[in-house]
UniProtKB/Swiss-Prot annotation:
Statement: the UniProt record of this protein carries the keyword Coiled coil: no
Species assigned in the record: Escherichia coli O6:H1 (strain CFT073 / ATCC 700928 / UPEC)
NCBIfam families, per database record: PRK10716.1 (NF007988)
Subcellular location: Cell outer membrane
Record gene name: fadL
Domain of life: Bacteria
Name the record gives this protein: Long-chain fatty acid transport protein
Length: 446
């Protein structure tokens, strides 16, 4: 079994195809925008200015650079996520191993000063992404199936230094997203088919649900959304500074294609049971609005000794803006619905940096990701859990212009138990995940 995301469109095809991953932060948020940040568990990112990647987190940091600076790299994710489960009605197994694939998450950053007060920057990252994929005949296919979300964020930002202490930054985000949702009848399909036939429904009407691999829902689409980000930087002196950053909510209004193997004559019966809208394989227009939530973060950096610094962050994401997945047809009918019910969540991180000499810099970090998914809303389509990060990394400077960052993190998610569905459609699950992340970036100052 595997999990994956696939996003291709014109010039974005190569970059987006590389970003194929299960979300390795809370919910379906991605943090992997730099390798130096990976090595410190992304602690202090709104206040550290050791490479151009930090500017994507806090645009006010642009004023910390006195030369045009470039950074490019990728983070490799090697996850291990298993799900064990069974049907509460029949006891049939719903186990799935290694449901998350290995993946690369690339990043590209550039920052340039204009003068002593103004500067600008640009970046290409991915802030949100999710994929769950089970085999077509998976027993709990009505909940598993395929759920793919991929985003690529294009950011352009500028900054202004008011004085020696205060700097302000503002950025514009253009987010390209592509999503796909597929659901299958699973073990519930043949059971429902038998019950309907026993109640006098012609067998021919149940052909769209009578096998586990019957595709009862398929929705896909791609679209652009737009948002903004802002940051403030306060410098007490060259060794102590703090940052406050904000990234706005981005609404993606998908208009795509929908189809279902279910016979439309069964919509009244199966719709009342929560199953998707049937089209008997015919494709029709479908729309879905996805809210990518806003995020606040406060960060600090303190060089407490000539060779030592500490850095820390607390991020707050308004996940309550993501309450449902609801696809509608042209006539306003509900094609597919899933109650998500996320709640706001936080992330805290603490790290330290050791400046060994002019060539070598070493860093470590620890972080805790609070899951936004309430216990009664957990799902195998978004198998989220609280996570602990342990990170380490280094930078080697070849000279005053060129350097390379290497970072590694180990993440462990707590084991969670939950039930999805009711009655004959109820399944009990247990999920646990862990992952290794490795990243490298090349930096160059002109």
């Amino acid at each position: 079994m595997s999990q994956k995301t696939l996003f291709t469109k014109s010039a974005l095809a190569v970059a987006v195809a590389l970003i194929s991953t299960q979300a390795w932060s809370a919910g379906f948020q991605l943090n992997e925008f730099s390798s130096s940040g990976l090595g410190r568990a992304y602690s202090g990112e709104g206040a550290i200015a050791d490479d151009a990647g930090n500017v994507s987190r806090n645009p006010a940091l642009i004023t910390m650079f006195d030369r045009p600076t470039f950074s490019a790299g990728a983070v490799y994710i090697d996850p291990d996520v298993d799900i064990t489960g069974h049907s509460d009605l029949t006891g049939q197994s719903a186990n799935a191993k290694n449901i998350a694939p290995t993946a690369w998450v690339p990043n590209l950053h550039f920052v340039a000063p204009i003068n002593d007060q103004f500067g600008w920057g640009a970046s290409i990252t991915s802030n949100y992404g999710l994929a769950t994929e089970f085999t077509d005949n998976y027993a709990a296919g009505i909940y598993g199936g395929k759920t793919d979300l991929q985003t690529i964020n294009l950011n352009l930002s500028g900054a202004y230094r008011l004085n020696n202490s205060w700097s302000f930054g503002l950025g514009f985000d253009a987010v390209y997203a592509k999503a796909k949702i597929e659901r299958y009848a699973g073990s519930l399909g043949p059971l429902l088919s038998q019950q309907l036939i026993a109640q006098g429904v012609p067998a021919s009407l149940t052909n769209g649900i009578n096998t586990p691999d019957s595709q009862i829902a398929h929705l896909k689409g791609d679209e652009w959304g737009f948002g903004w980000n802002a940051g403030i930087l306060y410098e007490l002196d060259k060794d102590n500074r703090w940052g406050l950053t904000y990234r706005s909510e981005v609404k993606i209004d998908f208009d795509g294609d929908y189809k279902s193997s279910i016979n439309p004559n069964l919509n009244n019966i199966l719709g009342n049971m929560g199953l998707p809208y049937g089209t008997m394989g015919a494709t029709q227009n479908g729309s879905l609005t996805l809210n990518l939530p806003e995020m606040w973060e406060i960060s600090g950096y303190n060089r407490v000794a000539p060779q030592w610094a500490i850095h820390y962050s607390m991020a707050y994401t308004s996940w309550s803006q993501f309450q449902e997945l609801k696809a509608k047809g042209d006539s306003g009918q509900t094609l597919f619905y899933k109650d998500e019910g996320f709640r706001d969540a936080y992330r805290i991180a603490l790290g330290t940096t050791y400046y060994y000499d002019k060539n070598w810099t070493f860093r470590t970090g620890i972080a805790y990701d609070d899951s936004p998914v309430p216990a009664d809303k957990r799902s195998i389509s978004i198998p989220d859990q609280d996570r602990l990060w342990l990170s380490a990394g280094l930078t080697y400077a070849f000279n005053e212009d060129a350097s390379i960052d290497v970072g590694a993190s180990y993440m462990h998610g707590q084991k969670v138990k939950f039930t999805e569905g009711e009655g004959a459609a109820a399944y009990s699950f247990e999920s646990e995940g862990k992952a290794w992340l490795f990243g490298t970036n090349f930096n160059y100052a002109f």
